[in-house]
Swiss-Prot record:
This is ADP-ribosylation factor GTPase-activating protein 2. InterPro entries: ARFGAP/RecO, ArfGAP_dom, ArfGAP_dom_sf. Interacts with the coatomer complex. Interacts with the C-terminal appendage domain of COPG1. The lineage of its organism: Eukaryota, Metazoa, Chordata, Craniata, Vertebrata. One of its GO terms (molecular function) is zinc ion binding.
Amino acid sequence: MAAEPNKTEIQTLFKRLRAVPTNKACFDCGAKNPSWASITYGVFLCIDCSGVHRSLGVHLSFIRSTELDSNWNWFQLRCMQVGGNANATAFFRQHGCTANDANTKYNSRAAQMYREKIRQLGSAALARHGTDLWIDNMSSAVPNHSPEKKDSDFFTEHTQPPAWDAPATEPSGTQQPAPSTESSGLAQPEHGPNTDLLGTSPKASLELKSSIIGKKKPAAAKKGLGAKKGLGAQKVSSQSFSEIERQAQVAEKLREQQAADAKKQAEESMVASMRLAYQELQIDRKKEEKKLQNLEGKKREQAERLGMGLVSRSSVSHSVLSEMQVIEQETPVSAKSSRSQLDLFDDVGTFASGPPKYKDNPFSLGESFGSRWDTDAAWGMDRVEEKEPEVTISSIRPISERATNRREVESRSSGLESSEARQKFAGAKAISSDMFFGREVDAEYEARSRLQQLSGSSAISSSDLFGDMDGAHGAGSVSLGNVLPTADIAQFKQGVKSVAGKMAVLANGVMNSLQDRYGSY
C-alpha cells in the first residue's frame, strides 16, 4: 500500500490548484477564496456551501477542508486534480442541469454521472502515477510560459537554426515578426518551410490567449450571481418547503390512522371483557336466587323486608351491552321497614322484641356491617345471636353513661333529633354543649329541668320542686309518668328514637350495599 501524503505535499498541491482562476470562487455561490472542497465532485466550496453539502450526506458529497484537514489520501487528491470548478460547470451545463437548489442539483442524473466520472478518473490517475505529486494534465493549470517554451523547443528541435539566429528566439512573442523577416531574407531556399513554421506559432499563442479569456468570463458571471444571492441561507426554495409540508401531512395521516386502529382494538377488548363480566354476573345472580328460594318463611320475609330479596324486586333491568333504559324510582323496601320500626318503637311494649337478626341473611354481610358502624359491643353481630334481656325502666342508662363512640352514629341521625332539641330548649335563655349532648350530671340536669318546668307557675311546693308527686296523683292511676320523672321520660323517648334512627341508618346501609353489589342485574 502506498504511503499517505504528508502535510507539505498537501499544502503544495492545493496551493497550485487554488491558483487556477476558476478555482478561486465557490462552485455553488461564487464567493471568493473557498477553503473547503467536495471530493465527490472535485470542486472548491465556501464554508456556507460546505455546510449545505454536509446536510446532503456523505453518499452525495464528501466534504473536507483544504487548510485544516491533514488526513488526505492519494485517491482524494487525484479526484481534486482531475476535477475542478471549470470541468464541473461545463459538465452540468452540458447535461442541462441549471438548478440552484442544492438538494435538486446534487440528486439529479447529471450529478450522479459526474460522481461516477470523477471516481473513474481518480482511480485511473492513481493507478498511473502512484504517489507522484503532479500528473500530466496539470500543465494546463500552470502559467502561460510553459506552452510557449514547449513551442520554442519544438521549433529549435526541427528547424535547427544557426548560432547567430539564437538570440532572435529569446525575445517575447511581440518581437517574433522581426526575426521572421530576417530569416526569410537570409535563407531563400528554406523560405517555404520556415514561413510555415513561423506562421503557426503566433496562431497557437492567440488560441491559447482566447481560451484563457473564455475561462475568465464564466468566473466573472458567477461572481455577479454570488453577489446577488448573498448568504447561503437564501438557497432554500419554495419547493423544499412544499415537500416538507407534504411529508408532514403524510406522517400526520399515518399517525391518525394508527391512533384509530389502537382505539378500535381497545374497544373490542373492552366489549369482550364486559361480555365475560355480564356472564359471570348472570351466574352469580342465579346462585343467589337459588339460595333465597331455599330459605324458610320468616327468614325470607326478613330478607325481602331489608331489600335482600332480589326475586321480589322489579324485573326491570338492562345489560351493559344493550341500550340504556330509563328506570323509574320505586320506594325502597328499607324505607317502609324503617318507618314501621319507628311506629313499633312508639309503643313501649313492643320494644322488647328487638331488631331483626341480620346474621340470618343469606349474604353473610354481618362482619362488613359490624366493621362499618364501628366495633361496638351493643351492635356487634355476634351479640345479636344471644338472647336479649327484657327491657325495663331500670335497665335504661342515661345518655352520659353510654359509649362515646356511638356519637358518630348519632351524628348521622341528627336530622331526626333536631326537632326534639328545639322542643327541649325552646324556653331556655342559654344552653351549653353539655346540655345539648346530655353530658351533664343526672342530679344537676334533673334540677334544671324541674326549674324550667316551674318557671311559669305562680306558686310551687316542695313536692313539685323535689319530685315528690305521690300525693298529687291517685294511687290507682299507674302510668309511665308516675314511675319516671318528666326528665327521665324525655330521655327515654329520646333514647328510643335514637335507637330507631340507628336502625334506620343501618337498614339503609344494608340496602345501599345490596344495590351497589347486585344493582347491575
